[in-house]
A protein has these predicted regions:
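Surface/interface recognition patches
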Residues: 1-142
Length: 142
């Protein structure tokens, strides 16, 4: 599969996707575990705030037992799908950080207000990608 980017008057970098090796998969799993350790506390704080606000009821006690925190995919735990192909992690490591964001910053120098436009492919649309764009101070349009 091929990936490329361009601007109004510039050709950007491109990339030809190769199958992922077993060693790359092991390294990816280790890095994802490290990322999960970094983001778990902030996600837990956010969950506790949202859950407690949802359970506030001035007239009576909420029904059922109090929800317990579990760090799962539903609450924001990062994981990879088992099917292979291009997922959020490979897209971030091979395209977003080394190729797309530097090109977008270069374009923003000549054209302030530059936006990165992507389709809603699962690798592009993953919630963690927005954090990367925010950290790099690049605007995007999905």
């Amino acid at each position: 599969m091929f990936w490329g980017c361009f601007s109004y008057d510039k050709k950007g970098p491109c990339y030809c996707w190769q199958p992922e090796t077993a060693q790359e998969k092991r390294i990816a799993e280790q890095e994802i575990e490290q990322l999960n350790c970094q983001i778990e506390q902030s996600l837990r704080d956010q969950w506790e705030l949202e859950t407690s606000m949802r359970r506030v009821n001035l007239r009576r006690q909420p029904a059922g037992k109090k929800p317990q925190w579990k760090f799962t995919k539903k609450t924001g735990k990062l994981s990879r799908g088992g099917k292979g192909g291009i997922d959020w992690y490979r897209y971030q490591k091979l395209i977003l950080l080394p190729k797309l964001l530097p090109f977008a910053k270069e374009c923003a120098i000549e054209r302030p207000g530059t936006l990165v436009q992507e389709d809603k492919a699962p690798a592009h649309n993953h919630y963690i990608q927005q954090r990367v764009f925010d950290l790099q101070e690049v605007s995007r349009l999905l």
